[in-house]
């Protein structure tokens, strides 16, 4: 599999630093979160880091699938919903965590379930920015982020070779 022109590979170390930066930003909100709802699968890793840093013990998942072929975003499929007790009061004490907001479709679907929750992600693309409350790094819409859990060691052509 060759990398697209605008590839953004993220190492484990970089992702850990960025997820901790997100935790710092969230801590600065002076808001008490009683639970994290992570959007799986991408939200699992940042949720683990953020839950440790903010001492949030209750972690729930919501399973929404949209990338069925790892390339193109397709129809949203809700595979697992959220525990009813976390949906009380619109989820006002809930922190929703994901790795990335791309088009914002996934966050928008989850926001219908938790309209008063705080939505946070590590990375954001312009179309997804309006659907989250807090993020760390914005990348262009046509950039493909390669997360460390999706990658092995691969060779990348130098940028200058593709500019020709």
Swiss-Prot record:
UniProt xrefs under Pfam families: Pribosyltran
Gene Ontology MF: a single term: magnesium ion binding
Necessary cofactors: Mg(2+)
Membrane topology listed for this record: Peripheral membrane protein
Binding site for 5-phospho-alpha-D-ribose 1-diphosphate: 41-42, 98-106
Keyword tags: Cell inner membrane, Cell membrane, Glycosyltransferase, Magnesium, Membrane, Metal-binding, Purine salvage, Transferase
Entry binding sites for GMP: 102-106, 144-145
Pathway info: Purine metabolism; GMP biosynthesis via salvage pathway; GMP from guanine: step 1/1; Purine metabolism; XMP biosynthesis via salvage pathway; XMP from xanthine: step 1/1
A GO cellular component entry from the record: plasma membrane
Coiled-coil region: none
Annotated positions binding guanine: 102, 145
Record-level GO BP terms: GMP salvage; purine ribonucleoside salvage; XMP salvage
Residue positions binding Mg(2+): 99
Compartmental location: Cell inner membrane
Catalyzed reactions per annotation: GMP + diphosphate = guanine + 5-phospho-alpha-D-ribose 1-diphosphate; XMP + diphosphate = xanthine + 5-phospho-alpha-D-ribose 1-diphosphate; IMP + diphosphate = hypoxanthine + 5-phospho-alpha-D-ribose 1-diphosphate
Family: Belongs to the purine/pyrimidine phosphoribosyltransferase family. XGPT subfamily.
PANTHER family in alphabetical order: XANTHINE PHOSPHORIBOSYLTRANSFERASE, XANTHINE-GUANINE PHOSPHORIBOSYLTRANSFERASE
Designated name of the protein: Xanthine-guanine phosphoribosyltransferase
Organism: Rhizobium johnstonii (strain DSM 114642 / LMG 32736 / 3841) (Rhizobium leguminosarum bv. viciae)
Gene symbol of the encoding locus: gpt
């Amino acid at each position: 599999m060759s990398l697209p022109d605008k590839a953004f590979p993220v190492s484990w170390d970089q992702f850990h630093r960025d997820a901790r930066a997100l935790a710092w930003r969230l801590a600065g909100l002076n808001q008490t979160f009683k639970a994290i709802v992570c959007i799986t699968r991408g939200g699992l890793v940042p949720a683990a880091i953020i839950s440790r840093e903010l001492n949030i013990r209750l972690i729930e998942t919501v399973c929404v699938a949209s990338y069925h072929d790892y390339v193109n975003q397709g129809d949203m499929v809700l595979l697992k919903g959220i525990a009813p007790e976390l949906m009380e009061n619109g989820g006002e004490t809930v922190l929703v965590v994901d790795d990335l907001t791309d088009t914002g479709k996934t966050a928008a679907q989850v926001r219908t379930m938790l309209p008063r929750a705080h939505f946070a992600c590590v990375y954001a693309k312009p179309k997804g920015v309006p659907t989250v409350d807090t993020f760390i790094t914005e990348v262009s819409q046509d950039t493909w982020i390669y997360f460390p859990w999706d990658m092995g060691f691969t060779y990348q052509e130098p940028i200058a070779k593709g500019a020709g």
